[in-house]
C-alpha cells in the first residue's frame, strides 16, 4: 500500500520530465522562428512598400515563416510535441492582455463591440445556413461552415461538430475554407487599413468582426499597430463569449432541418451546451482587468505584462504557422474556396462599411 502511494508521485515526476524532454525541440524551434520574425520585421520597415502599405510586423511574419518551413523543408516528428501549445500560448496572451485595460476602458470599447459582434455573428451564421441549404449542402456541413465563418474559425467548427454529428470530411472542408481566407486576410486587412487610413480603433473593430479565425484576428491587429491589436483582442474575446450561444442556435436549426427531412433527432440540453462551450480563459482576462482597475498592478508590472503578452502571441503564432499544412486546404476544392471566399469577402466588406459609417 505504502509503496503504491510513494510510487505515484515518482511516476508523475517521470511523466512530467518525459513530456518536457519531448516538447523541448519543438519549443526551441518555435522560439527560433519567433526570434527571426522579431529581427526581420524592423528591417522591412526601412522599405517604403512595407512601411506604407504592407504591415508585415513580427506577429504576421512568425506565421508566414512557420508556414514556409512547414511546407518546404517540413517539420520532423521530433519537433511535433512542442508544437501542441499554440492555443495555450495565444490564450495566455489574451489573459495577460487584461493588464492593458481598466473596467471603465473595457466598458467604453465593449459596449459598441458587443453590438457589432452580435449583428455580424448571428447574421453571418443565419445567412450561411440559408445559403448552404440553397446550394444543397448537407445540414452538418452547413452548420460547421456557419459556425466557422461566423464565430472564431477552427475552434467554432470543432465546437459545433459533435452537436450536429458532423463527419471528419465536413470538419476538414470547413477548416480548409476558414484557413484559406484567414491566410489571405493576414496580408489584405492591414493593406486595406492603410489604404482607407483607418485609426487603430477602427482597424481593431474591422479585423475583430471581419476576419474569420481568432489567431488571424490577433495577428492582423497587432500587425497593424499595438493599439489596434488590443482593440482586436477585445472584439475577439467578445466573439468567443458568444460561441456557446451561436453553437446552440445552429444546433437547434440543424435539428429542425434534420427533422423536416424525416431523420431522427436527439434532444438538445441547452444549458449543458452553453456551460460546456463557454471559454473559461475569458474569466482569466476579466480577473486581470479587475486587478489592474483596483491598482494592484504597478506601472512597471503592467509594462512587463505587455512584453509577456507580446511574446506569448509571437510564440503562439509561430507555432500555428509551423502546424499549418497547405495541402490540407485542398479539402475544400475550388468550389469550396470560391463559396467561402465570397461569403467571407462580403462579411469583410460589410465590416469595413460599418466601421467607416459608425466609428468615424
From Swiss-Prot:
**This protein's record includes keyword Membrane:** yes
**How is this protein positioned relative to the membrane?**
Multi-pass membrane protein
Tell whether Transmembrane helix is among the UniProt keywords.
yes
One Pfam family in the UniProt entry: Cons_hypoth698
Which UniProt keywords are present, listed alphabetically?
A: Cell membrane, Membrane, Transmembrane, Transmembrane helix
How is this protein annotated for GO cellular component? plasma membrane
**Family membership noted in the UniProt record:** Belongs to the UPF0324 family.
Could you tell me what this protein is called? Answer: UPF0324 membrane protein DVU_0123
Amino acid at each position: 500500500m505504502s509503496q503504491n502511494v510513494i510510487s505515484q508521485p515518482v511516476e508523475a515526476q517521470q511523466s512530467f520530465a518525459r513530456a518536457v524532454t519531448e516538447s523541448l525541440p519543438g519549443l526551441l524551434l518555435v522560439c527560433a522562428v519567433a526570434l527571426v520574425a522579431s529581427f526581420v520585421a524592423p528591417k522591412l520597415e526601412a522599405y517604403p512598400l512595407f512601411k506604407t502599405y504592407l504591415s508585415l510586423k513580427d506577429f504576421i511574419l512568425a506565421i508566414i515563416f512557420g508556414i514556409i518551413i512547414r511546407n518546404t523543408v517540413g517539420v520532423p516528428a521530433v519537433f511535433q510535441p512542442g508544437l501542441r501549445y499554440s492555443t495555450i500560448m495565444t490564450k495566455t496572451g489574451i489573459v495577460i492582455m487584461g493588464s492593458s485595460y481598466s473596467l471603465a476602458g473595457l466598458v467604453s470599447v465593449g459596449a459598441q463591440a458587443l453590438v457589432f459582434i452580435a449583428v455580424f455573428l448571428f447574421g453571418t451564421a443565419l445567412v450561411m445556413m440559408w445559403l448552404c441549404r440553397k446550394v444543397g449542402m448537407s445540414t452538418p456541413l452547413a452548420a460547421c461552415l456557419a459556425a466557422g465563418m461566423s464565430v472564431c474559425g477552427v475552434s467554432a467548427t470543432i465546437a459545433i461538430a459533435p452537436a450536429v454529428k458532423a463527419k471528419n470530411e465536413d470538419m476538414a472542408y470547413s477548416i480548409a475554407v476558414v484557413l484559406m481566407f484567414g491566410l489571405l486576410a493576414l496580408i489584405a486587412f492591414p493593406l486595406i487599413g492603410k489604404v482607407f487610413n483607418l485609426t487603430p480603433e477602427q482597424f481593431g473593430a474591422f479585423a475583430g468582426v471581419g476576419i474569420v479565425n481568432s489567431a488571424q484576428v490577433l495577428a492582423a491587429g497587432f500587425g497593424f499597430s499595438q493599439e489596434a491589436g488590443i482593440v482586436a483582442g477585445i472584439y475577439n474575446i467578445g466573439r468567443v463569449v458568444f460561441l456557446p450561444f451561436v453553437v446552440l442556435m445552429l444546433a437547434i436549426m440543424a435539428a429542425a432541418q434534420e427533422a423536416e427531412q424525416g431523420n431522427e433527432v436527439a434532444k438538445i440540453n441547452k444549458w449543458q451546451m452553453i456551460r460546456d462551450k463557454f471559454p473559461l480563459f475569458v474569466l482569466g482576462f476579466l480577473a486581470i482587468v479587475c486587478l489592474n482597475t483596483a491598482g494592484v498592478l504597478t506601472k512597471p508590472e503592467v509594462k512587463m505584462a505587455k512584453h509577456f503578452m507580446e511574446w506569448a502571441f509571437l510564440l503562439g503564432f509561430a507555432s500555428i504557422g509551423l502546424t499549418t499544412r497547405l495541402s490540407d486546404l485542398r479539402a475544400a476544392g475550388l468550389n469550396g474556396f470560391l463559396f467561402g471566399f465570397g461569403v467571407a469577402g462580403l462579411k469583410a466588406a460589410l465590416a469595413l462599411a460599418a466601421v467607416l459609417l459608425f466609428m468615424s
